[in-house]
């Protein structure tokens, strides 16, 4: 299929060569190299970072929470979206690099957020519609599948043209609007879900199309911020020694200190 070029970056290649050591470090003298094809077998987790979760168990947790949504309209939209996107939800990252930028990252992010939303819906039950919060949490990042382009390994390579022109908030709201219309969901509920998606970045300077103006959308934006920042801490702390301070973390606009060993 032609020589390997820079355009093949982040794709899998098959190499034939000789392994030796140079100054104590293993190296390969390459005799032949080609792009891997469908006949080649390899363990994806040995080549790229993957979420530290059991995918099937985590997917079952998400499906259980969807089933627990008591409002039939919100539950129907979520079930329909799950049926259409389940396979991609199992594998795609949630970002290119900032947080959850690994295989199954979006599933991990969504599941953690839904469990947090479920807890907080009970804590603030006097003002929160649990069904709306859980549905909005499940749906908030679905359009990332369209926002990014992906390598052969499943990692994010770039933003798609639509991703650059519209972004996942607008595309997500559009899809929810279309699905709600197909299912005959009342417009007021469709608009509320669209608002949840469009406002979940909290402030326009952080990418929100509109500010969250209902309790559920405010809570969703805070849950999203919490989980994304904790994942940034997790990834940063994993590379530090106890007592060490990191270099400046761009996404946090500060350094990170590791006071103790991680749990597990």
Protein language model features and the residues they cover:
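A ubiquitous short alpha-helical element
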Residues: 44-50, 100-103, 160-164
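Divalent metal-dependent catalytic cores for phosphoryl transfer on phosphate-bearing substrates
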Residues: 98, 108, 119-240
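A short mid-domain helix/strand-loop element embedded in enzyme catalytic domains
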Residues: 74-118, 139-147
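Short nucleic-acid-contacting surface segments enriched for D/E, G, S/T with interspersed K/R
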Residues: 1-16
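Short, charged beta-turn/beta-strand-edge "cap" motif at the junction between a beta-strand
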Residues: 18-23
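Extended, charge-rich, solvent-exposed interface segments
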Residues: 25-93
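N-terminal intrinsically disordered, cationic/polar leader segments
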Residues: 221, 243-255, 260-264
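Divalent metal-coordination and catalytic microenvironments
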Residues: 10, 113, 224
């Amino acid at each position: 299929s032609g020589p390997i070029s820079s355009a093949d970056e982040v794709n899998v290649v098959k190499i034939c060569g000789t392994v030796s050591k140079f100054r104590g470090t293993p190296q390969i003298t390459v005799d032949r190299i080609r792009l891997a094809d469908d006949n080649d077998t390899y363990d994806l987790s040995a080549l790229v970072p993957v979420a530290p979760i059991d995918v099937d168990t985590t997917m079952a947790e998400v499906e259980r929470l969807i089933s627990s949504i008591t409002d039939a309209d919100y539950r129907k939209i979520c079930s329909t979206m799950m049926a259409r996107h389940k396979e991609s939800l199992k594998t795609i990252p949630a970002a290119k690099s900032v947080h959850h930028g690994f295989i199954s990252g979006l599933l991990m992010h969504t599941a953690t957020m839904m469990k947090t939303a479920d807890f907080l819906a009970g804590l603030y039950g006097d003002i929160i519609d649990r069904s709306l919060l859980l549905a909005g949490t499940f749906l908030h990042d679905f359009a990332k599948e369209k926002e990014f382009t992906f390598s052969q390994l499943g990692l994010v390579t770039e933003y798609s043209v639509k991703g650059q022109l519209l972004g996942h908030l607008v595309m997500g709201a559009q899809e929810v609007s279309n699905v709600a219309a197909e299912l005959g969901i009342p417009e007021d509920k469709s608009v509320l879900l669209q608002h949840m998606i469009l406002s979940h970045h909290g402030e326009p300077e952080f990418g929100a199309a509109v500010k969250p103006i209902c309790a559920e959308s405010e809570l969703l934006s805070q849950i999203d911020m919490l989980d994304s920042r904790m994942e940034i801490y997790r990834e940063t702390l994993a590379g530090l020694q106890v007592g060490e301070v990191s270099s400046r973390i761009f996404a946090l606009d500060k350094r990170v200190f590791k006071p103790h060993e991680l749990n597990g």
